[in-house]
Design a protein with these regions (language model features):
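Flexible glycine-/small-residue-enriched beta->alpha junction loops
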Residues: 104-152
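Claisen-condensing/thiolase-fold acyl-transfer catalytic domains that form or cleave C-C bonds
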Residues: 20-21, 28-29, 35, 54-105, ...
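Short active-site-proximal "capping" loops at secondary-structure junctions
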Residues: 41, 50-57
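Flexible, glycine/charged-enriched surface loops at secondary-structure junctions
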Residues: 42-43, 154-158, 173-179, 226-227, ...
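Short, well-ordered, mixed-charge alpha-helical segments that flank or form enzyme active sites
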Residues: 112-116, 167-173, 342-343
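Glycine-rich, mobile lid/loop segments that gate access to catalytic sites or pores
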Residues: 135-196
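Signal peptide-proximal N-terminal region
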Residues: 33-44
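Generic N-terminal amphipathic, Lys/Arg-enriched alpha-helix
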Residues: 3-19
Length: 354
């Protein structure tokens, strides 16, 4: 495989509600910051790919407006995925492996505060049997959490401990929405919003945007910083019908992990950090088990999605945060992104600092 590296990243502050700027205005400064971080200009970029959701923006082909943030010139080959921008990164990675391009700029954005995100995401469900019932994402995640509790592996205290660690880690992340020291005992006093989930178990509504620069390593400039080379990447999807899945286990994640291990040659115990896209606290535990992670690997040093969750960019942020961790001393990072209800579709990547 061609050696593809992540070299630049920028993220807007993850705030609860952006009342002044629209999506383009949020995105524009982050593009400049990411290019500066990489030591590049738009003239150095061969391909642009984005991830967003028309249902969140409330308009068809809303991503076209975001192209304005790239500038009128120079013209660029552009593409879009109607899902998390982590899959936009995957599209760019494939193009680089195929020799079509050398460099790419990836971005994702979302203003979840303008709509009802838990209801909007029900459009990902089976259109014949589930979507017409309008089950929201929190209720579905609670269903999954109940299955996990009934398995006897974890309980609500374990869920709260995930949040405690997330908030503690997020204190080092200036862009995090939720950060600070909390205790599991205090968290467990909060009322349920959908048993066994409480508000803190759910990712916060967040407005923002993120931008990432990657390319074939030989074509990238030396910006004086460590780069994050993608040693392996794979994604797997499970069946659409929830009743046919083992909700307490993420089979697709385990399958993707096996492929990434074969590609990268990196054993699970060699990862210093893991950035996991788990929008609900029980899902962190499900992913940890599926990946075989131990306490040797620091999970979500950025705080993860429970500290800030830009819809359609949270998966891309896991890649960006892995770059930041590598630039701060980590050697290897495991990156995870998800799409669909209850961890239906999972993408994994092995990233190594050079």
């Amino acid at each position: 495989m061609r050696e593809v590296a992540i070299i630049g990243y920028a993220q807007s502050p993850q705030i609860r509600q952006e009342t002044v700027c629209n999506e383009v205005e949020i995105l524009m400064p982050e593009i400049d910051k990411a290019l500066t971080d990489a030591g590049m200009t738009m003239s150095d970029i061969d391909f642009v790919c984005s991830g967003s959701c028309d249902y969140i923006a409330g308009g068809a082909f809303s991503f076209v407006g975001a192209v304005d943030s790239l500038g009128a010139t120079p013209c660029k080959m552009e593409s879009h995925v109607e899902m998390d921008a982590a899959w936009a990164l995957y599209e760019a990675w494939i193009k680089i492996q195929a020799g079509e391009i050398k460099t790419a700029l990836i971005y994702g954005f979302g203003k979840s505060s303008v709509g009802q995100l838990p209801d909007v995401m029900s459009q990902q469900l089976d259109p014949y049997y589930l979507a017409p019932l309008w089950p929201d994402t929190i209720s579905l995640a609670a269903l999954q959490a109940n299955v996990l509790v009934q398995s006897g592996r974890y309980n609500e205290t374990d869920f709260a401990n995930v949040v405690v660690e997330s908030r503690r880690n997020a204190k080092a992340n200036n862009n995090a929405q939720l950060a600070g020291d909390v205790s599991a005992a205090d968290l467990l006093k909060a009322p349920y919003i959908s048993s066994p989930l409480r508000k803190h178990d759910c990712c916060p509504i967040t407005d923002g945007a993120s931008v990432l620069i990657l390319g074939e390593k030989s074509a990238l400039p030396d910006n004086g910083k460590r780069a994050a080379v993608i040693r392996g990447m794979d994604h797997r999807m499970e069946v659409h019908q929830l009743g046919l899945r083992e909700l307490a286990n993420s089979i697709s994640t385990a399958q993707a992990m096996a492929q990434v291990k074969d590609q990268s040659g990196i054993a699970v115990e060699q990862y210093d950090i893991a950035e996991l896209y788990a929008p609900f606290s029980p899902q962190t535990l499900i992913l940890k088990d599926a990946l075989g992670l131990t306490d040797k690997t620091h999970i979500n040093p950025s705080g993860g999605p429970l500290a800030g969750h830009i819809m359609m960019s949270a998966g891309l942020d896991r890649f960006g945060m892995s770059l930041r961790a590598i630039q701060n001393g980590a050697d290897r990072a495991l990156v995870h992104a998800t799409s669909g209800p209850c961890l239906q579709h999972n993408l994994l990547a092995a990233v190594e600092g050079v």
